[in-house]
Amino acid sequence: MNREEIIDIFTKTGAMLSGHFRLTSGKHSNRYFQCAQVLQHPQYTQKLCQELANRFENQGVQTVIGPAMGGILVSYEVARSLGVRSLFTERENGKMSLRRSFSLQPGEKVLVVEDVITTGGSVAEVIEVVKSLGGEVVGVGVLVDRSNGKANLGVRTEALLTVSVETYDPDNCPLCDQGLPAVKPGSRQIT
């Protein structure tokens, strides 16, 4: 898939939003990628996740893990394409962990996936969970990298779409200065 095909999917599904948004990272932005708008369409989910899977097909991936919520469908579909199992992490008392009797074997080769990264914070937490359980992270795959490649996760990272989107600290946000209310379209609570 080329960049234009990927952008076309995000545009057709209404997944690229403009306005004033509070991101999961706590930062503010004038653009938001609502990947759920894409992921509700199995034909697009399959196509995008197959492309991610192709980028890691020779890495010996044994398990794919994504953080709840956005990474669950991506993890499942990438794992299906690779013919391996899919797990997801969840927050428990504010800390990312594997629950539901999910486990990893020491040395298990894991691909971490996510729908969108801005700072890479959630993915970094998943990487730490994998390492703490003795797993080996072979890479990270994301649908959209809003950091324009600046999120350094310490492992090979593949993004289907890498974009540069303005982000602002809440204390220095021109959209707030204009009196525009910030909307929190994602699912994780900001503390």
UniProtKB/Swiss-Prot annotation:
It comes from Desulforamulus reducens (strain ATCC BAA-1160 / DSM 100696 / MI-1) (Desulfotomaculum reducens). Homodimer. Its EC number is 2.4.2.10. Pfam families: Pribosyltran (PF00156). This is Orotate phosphoribosyltransferase. It catalyses: orotidine 5'-phosphate + diphosphate = orotate + 5-phospho-alpha-D-ribose 1-diphosphate. Disulfide bonds: none annotated. 5-phospho-alpha-D-ribose 1-diphosphate binds at residues 114-122. SUPFAM superfamilies: PRTase-like (SSF53271). InterPro entries: OPRT, Orotate_PRibTrfase_bac, PRibTrfase_dom, PRTase-like. Its cofactor is Mg(2+). The keyword Magnesium applies. Pathway: Pyrimidine metabolism; UMP biosynthesis via de novo pathway; UMP from orotate: step 1/2. PANTHER family: OROTATE PHOSPHORIBOSYLTRANSFERASE, URIDINE 5'-MONOPHOSPHATE SYNTHASE. The lineage of its organism: Bacteria, Bacillati, Bacillota, Clostridia, Eubacteriales. GO terms for biological process: 'de novo' UMP biosynthetic process; pyrimidine nucleobase biosynthetic process. It comes from the Bacteria. Catalyzes the transfer of a ribosyl phosphate group from 5-phosphoribose 1-diphosphate to orotate, leading to the formation of orotidine monophosphate (OMP). Orotate binds at residues 118, 146. Belongs to the purine/pyrimidine phosphoribosyltransferase family. PyrE subfamily. GO terms for molecular function: magnesium ion binding; orotate phosphoribosyltransferase activity.
